[in-house]
A protein has these predicted regions:
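Formylglycine-dependent sulfatase
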Residues: 1-304, 312-313
Length: 314
């Protein structure tokens, strides 16, 4: 069991100490449509350390005191809900033939269909977010609520999730903060996941602990980052060591084990239909030289340097 240092507090813990009603739920909870056993079941909490579930009061904010502010972490199904998105009658659907793939992926029917289903999950998430926004508006809280929309990683493909290429590391980040952030503002400097912690505390007027490496993105103390650092080590049973530094234009990657292939054996990914399809076409000689080299080469370069303006696909 891994214990966090006693002096470090979880974000919901800091909010709770400040008088907030704290929530951990799913889109159904936040939209007010969860029922049955699901109604009282908390959202995803697969943290990698021991923690006290009491830092969260409920899956959603219905039971808070009159006028009590609330902090809610809402877990959407995201890109994992391909089947749900593909069969949903609430959203438009992408045709696999219309999919535009990164140049390093083959236009294999399985890959195209998977990517189309992945794009459908965007529409499903948009629909789910709309349900949550509708509830906030109905309750008169929308203009009084700061909302962050963020994902945990990129698409779970051969150069996406678990890797340091932009396909896995670059994620959407939207902020709704009435009277605090001007709508339509676009910022292009590097931002880290952890910055969400400091920014949340800043908007709530809660002191940001000095031990935090996170930076608030707004306010007089905001300092823009010049670069973002990322890493890959052990993923499931697969050992690796990759370090990367990205500025607004350049990406430098260093591979600690260049003698290992990009697609090392990994039980989590190896049975995915897309991986099977890519390997099948590789064995049959149907991949382009670029695809074969980037996906199925037995070795990697020790160092990689990309000009993202001229080579956005790395």
């Amino acid at each position: 069991k891994i214990q966090k240092p006693e002096h470090i507090k979880l974000i919901p813990e800091l909010f709770k100490e400040a008088g907030y009603f704290t929530c951990l739920g799913s889109s159904g909870h936040a939209a007010g449509i969860a029922s049955g056993k699901q109604k009282n079941r908390f959202g995803k909490s697969d943290y990698n350390f021991e923690w006290d579930p009491k830092v969260f009061d409920a899956p959603e904010w219905s039971d808070r005191k009159q006028g009590q502010p609330f902090f809610a972490k809402i877990c959407l199904s995201g890109g994992k809900a391909r089947s749900q998105a593909r069969s949903s009658k609430d959203i438009p659907h992408v045709k696999s033939a219309d999919v535009k793939l990164p140049p390093y992926y083959p236009r294999h029917p399985v890959v195209l269909e998977d990517w189309a289903a992945y794009l459908d999950t965007f529409s499903l998430m948009d629909f789910q977010v709309g349900q949550i926004v509708d509830r906030l508006k109905k309750e008169g809280e929308f203009e009084n609520t700061v909302i962050f929309f963020i994902t945990d990683h990129g698409v779970s493909h051969a150069r996406g999730k678990q890797f340091c290429y932009d396909e896995g590391m670059m994620i959407p980040f939207f902020v709704h903060a009435p009277s605090r952030v001007q709508a339509g503002t676009v910022r292009k400097e590097p931002v880290l996941h952890i910055d969400l912690a400091a920014t949340s505390l800043y908007f709530a007027g809660i002191e940001i602990p000095k031990y935090m490496e996170a930076r608030t993105l707004f306010g007089p103390d905001a300092v823009k980052r010049k670069f973002a650092v990322s890493a890959r080590d052990r993923c499931d049973e697969t050992y690796d060591r990759i370090r990367a530094v990205r500025t607004s234009r350049y990406k430098y990657i260093r591979n600690g084990y260049p003698n290992r292939p990009q697609l090392q054996p990994c039980a989590y990914k190896d049975n995915k239909d897309t991986y099977v399809a890519i390997r099948d076409w590789g064995e049959k000689g149907k991949l382009s030289d670029l695809q074969q080299n980037l996906l199925l080469s037995p070795k990697r370069a020790k160092e990689e340097l990309y000009d993202l303006k001229n080579d956005p696909w790395e």
